[in-house]
């Protein structure tokens, strides 16, 4: 007891107790703040899921089912991930305006907040590809134009044409132009495979290679279109072929007419 009393009277006891008290209060505050932030985030996510569910029931369930299980006219959305919803709804392809062979890009029906709520709701049903963030989509930093052009010609040009202008497919379907598409939506299309497009997993195209493809597309958008008419970015070759074909055809026609007249 006497020793404890002497320790209490020690000149360092006061500062040590003060430091200990501050550390205790700071630690308690940090723990409480972390718990509060987690609770707030969970509450916000729950609210988004509920909002997305109501939007889904109102605008999507008639085709995809009340529980997104799919049906006769629409596939299941369980496991497609937030990226698929963000692409389809964020580009106006969904909801479809008619039951055609392929969903066309059109004006977006929902606000960005509603699109995100729908994506969060569908993502809550089962794991799937996530919406890429700004850090991941830094194609200017992590992409290569030369590599992207080579990858595009190898993997994409057979459908989207070598200049990314799109092209016709079978059974009334088509590959849309990739010009003017947001980088986020290009990345989402690569990882989700919308419509007739295959899925390019990270084993097929790494995230860095996907960024290179995006960088090449964005570079191609800024390139001047040569020739009198912008026919698919082919340049003057198309116009020259057209003039040559018409010119030769007219000359042949004139030659035949003159020969017939001479008889």
Predicted regions and their residues:
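Ser/Thr/Pro/Gly-rich low-complexity linker/stalk segments immediately outside membranes or between
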Residues: 33-47
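Sequence context surrounding c-type heme c attachment/ligation sites in exported
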Residues: 32, 50-57, 82, 149, ...
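Extracytoplasmic electron-transfer domains, predominantly the class I c-type cytochrome c fold
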Residues: 78-126, 172-225
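N-terminal secretory signal peptides that target proteins for export/translocation
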Residues: 1-7
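Periplasmic/extracellular electron-transfer cofactor-ligation site
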Residues: 45-49, 53-79, 87, 91-97, ...
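C-terminal capping alpha-helices of c-type cytochrome domains
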Residues: 11-34, 107-133, 201-263
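N-terminal soluble segments of membrane proteins
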Residues: 2, 141, 245-249
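Ferredoxin-like iron-sulfur electron-transfer modules
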Residues: 139-146
């Amino acid at each position: 007891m006497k020793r404890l009393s002497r320790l209490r009277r020690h000149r360092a006891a006061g500062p040590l107790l003060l430091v200990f008290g501050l550390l205790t209060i700071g630690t308690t505050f940090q723990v409480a703040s972390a718990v509060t932030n987690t609770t707030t985030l969970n509450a916000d996510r729950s609210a988004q899921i509920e909002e997305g569910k109501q939007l889904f029931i109102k605008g999507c369930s008639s085709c995809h089912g009340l529980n997104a299980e799919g049906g006769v006219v629409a596939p299941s959305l369980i496991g497609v991930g937030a990226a698929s919803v963000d692409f389809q709804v964020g580009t106006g392809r969904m909801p479809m305006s008619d039951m055609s062979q392929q969903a066309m890009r059109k004006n977006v029906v929902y606000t960005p907040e509603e699109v995100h709520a729908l994506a969060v709701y569908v993502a809550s049903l089962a794991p799937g590809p996530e919406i890429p963030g700004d850090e991941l989509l830094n194609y200017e930093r992590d992409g290569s134009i030369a590599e992207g052009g080579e990858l595009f010609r190898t993997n994409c040009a057979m459908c989207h044409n070598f200049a990314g202008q799109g092209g016709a497919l079978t059974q009334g379907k088509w590959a849309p132009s990739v010009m003017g598409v947001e980088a986020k939506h290009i990345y989402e299309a690569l990882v989700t495979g919308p419509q007739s497009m295959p899925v390019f997993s990270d084993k097929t195209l790494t995230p860095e290679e996907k960024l290179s493809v995006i960088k090449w597309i964005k570079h191609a958008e800024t390139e001047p279109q040569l020739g009198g008419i912008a026919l698919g970015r082919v340049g003057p070759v198309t116009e020259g072929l057209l003039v040559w074909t018409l010119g030769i055809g007219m000359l042949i026609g004139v030659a035949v007419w003159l020969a017939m007249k001479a008889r």
